[in-house]
Curated annotation (Swiss-Prot):
Taxonomic path: Bacteria, Pseudomonadati, Campylobacterota, Epsilonproteobacteria, Campylobacterales
Gene responsible for this protein: leuA
Reactions catalysed: 3-methyl-2-oxobutanoate + acetyl-CoA + H2O = (2S)-2-isopropylmalate + CoA + H(+)
UniProt: Mn(2+) binding residues: D15, H201, H203, N237
UniProt protein name: 2-isopropylmalate synthase
HAMAP family to which the protein is assigned, alphabetical: LeuA_type1
Length: 504
């Protein structure tokens, strides 16, 4: 093993999916997985195979298609979880089972209701059983950063003796600050030595996930876990793009340490994940935020124009952020379209390619200029599509005075159903029509409109979160030049997601 290489462990498809509204289907996860492979990620946590049949299928499909990356599944320290992980990962060329159990006093007492000795025994049995499926086993001490050091050492020793090759020390609740994690990881690294790779997994509850990850690397950790765009539960995970670019940019601090990440794939990966999940990075997000390379101040603008390095410590080109150039038009053919998709990181089967191309030609008839972001949005809409129980065939809308009206026709069970409604605004009227036609009442929890590219004829992307029949809220996404049609598509998309999850 190269002791200077930092192993990049991406958990966007597992921990990142736990962001509210970020649920992904198998086709979406597969597209992200293939892009993570192009990015140069070392280990990809493809999911939690035991969580549901959908998760099992996603892990299994990724295991079949990934080739130059280690595919990993999370598993609690219970036989059922480990068996599911092992079976889902079976086709993978390189595979890893990541098993875990909580080790902090509060978790052992109140969540597990187990004694420390029982927790150690459970950990050992989990690692040993995992080894029957694959040689590469990672063991995590959940809530390690609130665990007693003496117990951490004891359970890590037991896991290594049982066959674990990686020991992960997560700050599950994002509690520590850099000096604390430096001290803790230094002691663990000194104790473990060369017997296993020490890994860290930091959450961002106090805004220190990236700083803590970098501090842990300096303290001797050689694997770092995180997500693209920093998505994840609560305040999210350590943002891998920040960690990678910090190591690359500050070689005066980190040399001879390095990662195998292909930095020009960072921005395409970020955009793909944002398009699929509907979760946009905050505008001032480091590395991938839309303002990351924007300069408003006149003094800054003057400096950048004279010499970029006056105010830019990394270049936009180094992360693959090229000018959002005009790319294709209505006379472009299928081959040119396919080549453009490949350059943007998409790998579609022939059926999906044909459908995406039809949408592109339709857009080209309506929109004078088509940009990379338009293409990304079109394809993301196609690969995120689920079975359509309800499908819009026509929409008429009007507004003026105190109320707006909407008339809509929707295909359901091979029949066209039409209805109308009034509302406090056009979007409200549209949502009421959908409720009337479907007979399923929804409560709008969130509504967001984004311009995909530039110009007066820019595509509108609408993301909604809707709670149907008092059940868990689901997300819907819509794309159209007409903002209200995009809103209708998003709401109907949420309805279809609800039916797929709760009715089937």
């Amino acid at each position: 093993m190269d002791k200077n290489k930092i192993i990049i462990f991406d958990t966007t498809l597992r921990d990142g999916e736990q962001s509210p509204g970020a649920s992904m289907n198998t086709a979406e996860k597969l597209q992200i997985a293939l892009q993570l492979e192009r990015l140069g990620v070392d280990v990809m946590e493809a999911g939690f195979a035991a969580a549901s049949p959908g998760d099992f299928d996603a892990v299994n499909q990724i295991a079949k298609q990934a080739s130059n990356i280690t595919v990993c599944s999370l598993a609690r320290a219970v036989e059922r979880d480990i068996k599911a992980a092992g079976e889902a990962l079976a086709p993978a060329k390189n595979k890893r089972i990541h098993t875990f159990i909580a080790t902090s006093p509060i978790h052992m007492q109140y969540k597990l209701k187990m004694s420390p000795d029982e927790v150690i025994r459970c950990a050992v049995e989990a690692v040993q059983y995992s080894k029957t499926f694959c040689d590469d086993v990672e063991f995590s001490c959940e809530d390690a950063c609130r665990s007693e050091m003496s117990f951490l050492k004891e359970i890590c020793e037991a896991a290594i003796n049982a066959g674990a090759k990686t020991i992960n020390i997560p700050d599950t609740v994002g509690y520590l600050y850099p000096e604390e994690i430096t001290a803790r990881i230094s002691e663990i690294v000194k104790f473990i030595g060369d017997r296993a790779v020490v890994s860290v997994h930091n959450h961002n509850d106090l805004g220190m996930a990236t700083a803590n990850s970098l501090a842990a690397i300096k303290a001797g950790a050689r694997q770092v876990e995180g997500t693209i765009n920093g998505i994840g539960e609560r305040a999210g995970n350590a943002a891998l793009e920040e960690i990678v670019m910090a190591i690359k940019t500050r070689q005066d601090v980190f040399a001879p340490l390095y990662t195998g990440i292909i930095s020009k794939e960072i921005y395409p990966t970020s955009r793909l994940i944002a398009s699929i999940t509907g979760i946009e990075p905050q505008p001032n997000k480091a590395i991938v935020g839309k303002n990351a390379f924007a300069h408003e101040s006149g003094i800054h603008q003057d400096g950048v124009l004279k010499h970029k390095e006056t105010y830019e410590i990394i270049s936009a080109e180094s992360i693959g952020l090229e000018k959002n150039s005009l790319v294709l038009g209505k006379h472009s053919g299928r081959h040119a379209f396919k080549d453009k998709l490949a350059s943007l990181g998409f790998d579609l089967d022939s059926d999906a390619l044909n459908k995406a191309f039809e949408k592109f030609k339709d857009l080209a008839d309506k929109k004078k200029e088509i940009f990379d972001d338009d293409i990304r949005a079109l394809v993301a809409e196609e690969i995120t599509k689920i079975p359509q129980a309800y499908e819009i065939t026509d929409l008429l809308q009007s507004s003026g005075g105190s109320l707006a009206s909407a008339s809509m026709s929707i295909r359901h069970n091979d029949e066209i159903v039409s209805d109308s409604a009034l509302g406090n605004g056009t979007a409200d009227a549209i949502f009421k029509v959908v409720d009337r036609i479907s007979g399923i009442n929804g409560t709008l929890k969130d509504y967001k409109v984004t311009a995909v590219s530039q110009g007066k004829d820019a595509l509108a992307k609408v993301d909604v979160k809707v709670e149907f029949e008092g059940k868990t809220a689901v997300m819907g996404h819509g794309l159209d030049i007409d903002t209200m049609m995009a809103s209708a598509k998003a709401y109907v998309g949420a309805l279809n997601s609800y039916l797929r999850i709760h009715k089937n």
